[in-house]
Amino acid sequence: MEYTTLIARLKNASESFVNLEMQLADPDIANNPKKLESIARERAKLEPLVLDFNQLLDTDKEIGDSKQLLKENRNDKDMESLINEELFSLEDLKNQLIEKLTIALLPKDPRDERSVMLEIRAGAGGNEACIWAGDLARMYERYGQKIGWTVKPISASESDMGGFKELVISVKGDSVYSQLKFEAGVHRVQRVPATESQGRVHTSTATVAVMPEADPVEVKIDPTEIEIGTARSGGAGGQNVNKVETAIDLIHKPTGIRVFCTQERSQLQNRERAMEILRAKLYEIQLKEANAKERSQRLMQVGSGDRSEKIRTYNFKDNRTTDHRLGSNFALEPILAGQLDDVIYACLAQEQKRMLEDFNENEN
């Protein structure tokens, strides 16, 4: 991006920021909580950009002042050396800010702000794969709780030996998809199962699909294409469990997608949850079709985001987690405890670097 173009766009953003601050001071808006929240959210998004822009302007001014000072001290070699050293640092800072601001102005994935449905399925490895699926679910639950998201299981198929054959988790909060989209794919574990008497290491897998929540307007579902059955829920619920059919078994006939929802206490709530899951699954199909038609506009994920792509290996013997997209290793225990920030931010940095390279290629 040309420097003059960058500055022009940043000035527009700065003007928008000032305008939003003026609106926040407006008594009429202050009396409208919904509008106030919307404006405050927009202001919060722009604030880091404006702060970096102001730092860029300050750095530019310091560079100009240093160059003028250099002209005035041509005969003083010691002073000239000090000024050149300062100029080198300032130019380096300026280049860093330009790259950071250029990335910030690149087109965003419109789904980044959304909440998601996480679908975790046991893969190869039998009962151990089901246990591993449960471990992954707890990892994401801990990560979400640390950030302040609302994490809730909404559909589960438990294994007889523990863990889950399949589990769908609702994760609600700000910008959930922007972070969890990097978790889509195959997660492989290498460890000695509790049931292994010979101490042999087994390899098991679980697949994770990250589905941004879809608005009913985006995904229209024909009621005539849905087959709904009911069943008695199992699990917590006291005497109500086996007497009332609260579970919902939903089938979308055109795609064959089946959703079995038991987590809520009423049939109506389970039906609503089942429809949310179905809508997210259909939305994911739409996204994949769009991405297949236009490769340059893929899911903006590191790798393909395909649930069949192996993205990470968790090695218990060596206490090591390897992210295959990054080619980097991380300590195992903190990752399983929900401390995913380092790996997610590394994936984000890799994504931003690739986006910047693509942008520069298109500019040339």
From Swiss-Prot:
Entry-linked SUPFAM superfamilies: Release factor
Post-translational modification: Methylated by PrmC. Methylation increases the termination efficiency of RF1.
GO molecular-function term, one example from the UniProt record: translation release factor activity, codon specific
A GO cellular component entry from the record: cytoplasm
UniProt entry keywords in alphabetical sequence: Cytoplasm, Methylation, Protein biosynthesis
One Pfam family this sequence matches: PCRF
PROSITE patterns assigned: RF_PROK_I (PS00745)
InterPro entries: PCRF, Pep_chain_release_fac_I, Pep_chain_release_fac_I_sf, Prokaryotic/Mito_RF, RF-1
Modified residues (N5-methylglutamine): 239
Subcellular location(s) of the protein: Cytoplasm
Superkingdom assignment: Bacteria
Stated family: Belongs to the prokaryotic/mitochondrial release factor family.
Entry-linked PANTHER family: LD18447P (PTHR43804), PEPTIDE CHAIN RELEASE FACTOR APG3, CHLOROPLASTIC (PTHR43804:SF8)
Known role: Peptide chain release factor 1 directs the termination of translation in response to the peptide chain termination codons UAG and UAA.
Protein name from the UniProt record: Peptide chain release factor 1
Organism encoding this protein: Prochlorococcus marinus subsp. pastoris (strain CCMP1986 / NIES-2087 / MED4)
Gene symbol of the encoding locus: prfA
